[in-house]
Amino acid sequence: MLKIIFPSIMLLPLTWLSANKKIWTNVTSYSFLVSLLSLSLLWQNDENYLNFSVMFSSDPLSTPLIILTTWLLPLMMLASQNHMKKENMMHQKLYISMLISLQILLIMTFSATELILFYILFEATLIPTLIIITRWGNQTERLNAGIYFLFYTLIGSIPLLIALISIQNSMGTLNFLILSLTTHPLPSTWSNTILWLACMMAFMIKMPLYGVHLWLPKAHVEAPIAGSMILAAILLKLGGYGMMRVSIILDPLTKSLAYPFIILSLWGMIMTSSICLRQTDLKSLIAYSSVSHMALVITAIMIQTPWSFMGATMLMIAHGLTSSLLFCLANTNYERIHSRTMIMARGLQMIFPLMATWWLLASLANLALPPLINLMGELFIVMATFSWSNPSIILMATNIVITGIYSMYMIITTQRGKLTSHMNNLQPSHTRELTLMALHIIPLMLLTINPKLITGLTM
């Protein structure tokens, strides 16, 4: 694990010691090398942990998320260059340092083997994200979004800390490797119900669950491009990862306590998909579609069958790449038109035909087109939910239809139609932008060939 963490830490001195002209090139190319290094984690057995030390190890659930984290840093560097070029060098270096420190914290979070260490790192990711949103966001509403993000996360996390200390006292350890071996079923008492809620709510707010999702659209809309990418691709997945890890300890309780949350997330899935249909703001639409997809993941994790866990892991990885791609595309529009309103950007297919191709591919990936891993993940979840409760197929089918409708609405509004009069001197697509889109789509295509890499814990 240190072979990934140490090179990531060394990106910080590279940022501050590089020549001003070379800074973006150096950091981008070096972070690509780090992401290639992380691929070595895939060469491991199906079931066992790769134990690197007492503190850090990886297994089939954390490995895909670590690789996704390292893959995203160079992509964020590519996406941010135009946004940051007006800032002075000091601010540019600070911005890059924030993204690097976020990557280091995320890699350590996903590879932590001890729950208190996981909790500390899980909370530490909040600080760089908050600074990125409140310092480099576009509008003044970014401060409001930052406050929402901070307080929602903190209110969920404080009960989690108390619950973890309580579990430490009763079990004597919080190490994943030992906890999975201890047979210590929690009896169904009031105090254990509160313990379960305290453990799960922190992760549900991070996912986010419908009802505690209000921070997400605000944070996404106000964040700069790199903030939106890392938030959609990785930080939401922290919630799902945490739920999968903690559910090992809370085993028999989840079966009875999961019902209201499964129902709420299924209902929320329909509601947020419907909200997407009446959005005028492009980033807001993508943010609400993220809530809808994450509701599927919450449902799958709560059902707790091998198929649903596989579906949840696959959908998390697929959604990470797809939503990040959609935010990049929205950003290319914003940099040219200086507005997120979809109706202002109509007819862009006439000017940017190649970018329209990426829009089409991204929309199709978002609505889970066969044979992409998005579809495999959703199919596993739909089948697991159907075997849990037959009537749930109605809600699932409705959601799939609405997802198709809002994906079409998004692409037709932004790409088709007559050009508006204010679009007279737009700069063409840069090679940097087209490369960025390709680097999102290619992993999605390649994972379709071998989805076994991201099926996660098959219990």
UniProtKB/Swiss-Prot annotation:
Q: Which segments cross the bilayer? A: 23-43, 60-80, 92-112, 113-133, 147-167, 194-214, 224-244, 257-277, 284-303, 308-330, 350-370, 393-413, 434-454
List, in alphabetical order, the Gene Ontology terms for molecular function in this entry: NADH dehydrogenase (ubiquinone) activity; ubiquinone binding
Query: What's its EC?
Result: 7.1.1.2
Q: Which UniProt keywords apply?
A: Electron transport, Membrane, Mitochondrion, Mitochondrion inner membrane, NAD, Respiratory chain, Translocase, Transmembrane, Transmembrane helix, Transport, Ubiquinone
What reactions does this protein catalyze?
a ubiquinone + NADH + 5 H(+)(in) = a ubiquinol + NAD(+) + 4 H(+)(out)
Q: Report the subcellular localization.
A: Mitochondrion inner membrane
> Might you name a Gene Ontology BP term for this protein?
cerebellum development
Q: Which NCBIfam families match?
A: NDH_I_M
Q: What does this protein do?
A: Core subunit of the mitochondrial membrane respiratory chain NADH dehydrogenase (Complex I) which catalyzes electron transfer from NADH through the respiratory chain, using ubiquinone as an electron acceptor. Essential for the catalytic activity and assembly of complex I.
Protein name stated in the entry = NADH-ubiquinone oxidoreductase chain 4
Species of origin: Rattus norvegicus
Gene expressing this chain: Mt-nd4
